A protein has these predicted regions:
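Active-site glycine-rich loop that binds ribose-phosphate moieties when present
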Residues: 174
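A conserved active-site cap/scaffold subdomain adjacent to cofactor or substrate pockets
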Residues: 167-171
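Conserved "HGTGT" condensation-loop signature of ketosynthase/thiolase-family condensing enzymes
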Residues: 1-57, 61-63, 68-70, 76-162, ...
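Active-site core segments that coordinate phosphate-bearing ligands/cofactors
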Residues: 187
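Cysteine-clustered segments with highest specificity for TGF-beta superfamily mature ligands
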Residues: 190-192
Length: 289
């Protein structure tokens, strides 16, 4: 998995090098990305600094969203106009430990299905993508929901670690650059994704050079809340359980604490922690989930 993530983000780095707006245009190899170092410190296994968003950046972006009537009055050239075609979102929030499926949020799939089905009914197929990249799992979950092959580029900017991820404003940056890309190549159909918090909320949008369909949008929160019902937390202090997810937190490249999400025999959840050095070592060498 570390090798996979290294190669995945090496490609992001290569794309950032070609982005004149990118914060960091240096190309990092897969080996540099996956290997902890003084400048690429491990944050939480298996993620290092270069896997995560660079939010301490000085960047700004803007776009003008208006009606065609106003655009005509302002004499905005048709060559500069790009149209939102369809969007979807979910705001159903559940604590990570209580999610029925840690890596398969119902809201994400409902929102994705609506987006692709709405576009598909008008023979609209996305050709370029900007998947939110605060950390690799965000990219991977969206790619899986969208059924994108590994070989398909997941970013046009270079992603948040390299292009820059200005805190909660990256979606505006991604959209502005997507519109630039579509202006430069009008045949492209762009798809952008976003998240909030710990993969808590998800949103998607498709843009095109021409108004190929009447704009559609849907909030699937209510539907998602009926499917993803929070799992109860366990009050048991001992017993057996199944590990659903785990990581080890690091400070200055030294392991400090392992964290486990566990489901007990009653189907309830528990969050466990350990500072045992043998567990630190074992968790990095064997699959616990």
């Amino acid at each position: 998995h570390e090798n996979f993530l290294g190669s995945y983000y090496e490609r992001f780095s290569e794309i950032a090098q070609q982005n004149p707006h990118a914060w960091n245009q240096k190309v990092f190899t897969a080996e540099e990305i996956k290997t902890p170092s003084e400048k690429n410190q491990r944050i939480a296994y298996p993620y290092n600094k270069l896997h995560n968003s660079s939010w301490n950046v000085n960047q700004a972006s803007a776009l003008i969203l208006c009606s065609e009537e106003l655009a005509d009055k302002l004499n905005v050239p048709t060559s500069k106009r790009v149209y939102p075609l369809v969007s979807s979102e979910t705001n159903h929030m559940i604590a990570v430990a209580q999610r029925p499926h840690l890596t398969r949020p119902a809201g994400l799939y409902l929102a994705t299905d609506f987006l692709l089905e709405s576009a598909g009914s008008h023979q609209i197929k996305p050709s370029i993508f900007e998947l939110y990249s605060c950390f690799p799992v965000a990219v991977q979950l969206f790619a899986e929901a969208l059924n994108l092959p590994d070989a398909t580029d997941k970013t046009i900017t270079g992603g948040m670690p390299f292009a820059g991820g200005p805190l909660n404003n990256y979606m505006l940056h991604a959209t502005a650059q997507m519109l630039e890309s579509i202006r430069n190549k009008p045949s492209e159909i762009g798809l952008i994704t976003g998240v909030s918090g710990l993969m808590t909320k998800q949103a998607l949008a498709i843009w095109g050079k021409e108004p190929l369909m009447d704009f559609q949008s849907k909030d699937v929160t209510s539907e998602a809340s009926r499917i993803d019902i929070p799992v109860a937390m366990s009050a048991n202090n001992d017993g057996e359980g199944t590990v659903l997810g785990c990581t080890t937190l690091f400070e200055h490249n030294e392991a400090v604490k392992s964290i486990f999400y566990v489901e007990d025999s009653q189907g309830e959840r528990k969050v466990l922690t350990s500072t045992d050095k043998d567990i630190f070592k074992n968790l990095g060498e064997q699959e616990w989930v």
